[in-house]
Amino acid sequence: MRILLLGKDGQVGWELQRSLVPLGELIALGRQETDLEDLDALRRCVRAHRPEVIVNAAAYTAVDKAEAEPEKAQRINAGAVDVLAEEANRANAWLVHYSTDYVFDGKKSSAYREDDPTGPLSVYGKTKLEGEQCIRQHHAKHLIFRTSWVYGARGGNFAKTILRLAKEKDELNIIADQHGAPTSAELIADVTALALYRISQSESHATLAGTYHLVAGGETTWHGFARHLLELVRARDVELKVQPENVRPIPTEAYPLPAKRPQNSRMDTAKLSNTFSLHLTNWRYHVQRLVDELVSQTAK
């Protein structure tokens, strides 16, 4: 299997470099090698490498900044994806793409299923949904993984920001009325590799194509995520300035941001679990692994 990975230096891309290697020949490219805003160059890149699988882990993810530069977000999250879908179809290659809970408006009272109506609230969400639609329009052999609240040991994310602030501040105010599942880049990468392996071994692999919700098990709030993370760090004797009682819950309206977020980011993963025979571990498991990794790095 010849795999072209785009976005190798991001949180998910970094983990994909590890998980995809056993599947065959991996060509991993980052921003320096491939500029997703240059659509002609992107097309030439795909044709030059002649992949059997394209894994697109590159995206415009600055949710609030996208409100001020929608054209750039659209070009990367939709325009570039449109090119990838066309080229995957031309080469009869599989295309793996990552989307987001932000394609939903968050008003549903229960977990979102893959076939629920979408209704993005932000430029970021709208461009990610447009990218999904480009893939479905151009190419049948695809996997679209919608995920949420992504974190990892590499790159910037909520978990690492909270750890930094907990060492600097006496008090933290964290949003407590948005619900979802913190999902590690490690889990996303491992599930991607397993899905591609199953496809490679299946005689009816076309039936496995489609959109799947890929998030960790369980649910929490941003406040619950932060509290649990800091409890684990404190248990490892890491000195924190903020005390547990000073990690305070606040409503969304108390922390206004340029881009609106869905209050309900819970996603039903039954389709993914049943199709690929997977057990998606509770979100706390991978948070523990993150803490272990970060603490061990600090100790070196």
List each model region and its residues.
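N-terminal Rossmann NAD(P)H-binding glycine-rich loop of SDR-like oxidoreductase domains
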Residues: 2-20
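SDR active-site strand-loop-helix element
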Residues: 6, 29, 54-58, 95-100, ...
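Adenosine-cofactor binding site in Rossmann-like domains, unifying the SAM/SAH pocket
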Residues: 21-44
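NAD(P)H-binding glycine-rich loop region in Rossmannoid oxidoreductase-like domains
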Residues: 39-78
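Catalytic helix-loop patch of NAD(P)-dependent Rossmann-fold dehydrogenases
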Residues: 75, 79-83, 90, 103-145, ...
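NAD(P)-dependent short-chain dehydrogenase/reductase
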Residues: 136-194
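Mid/C-terminal beta-alpha module of Rossmann-like enzyme folds, strongest
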Residues: 191-192, 198-256
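Amphipathic terminal alpha-helices
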Residues: 281-300
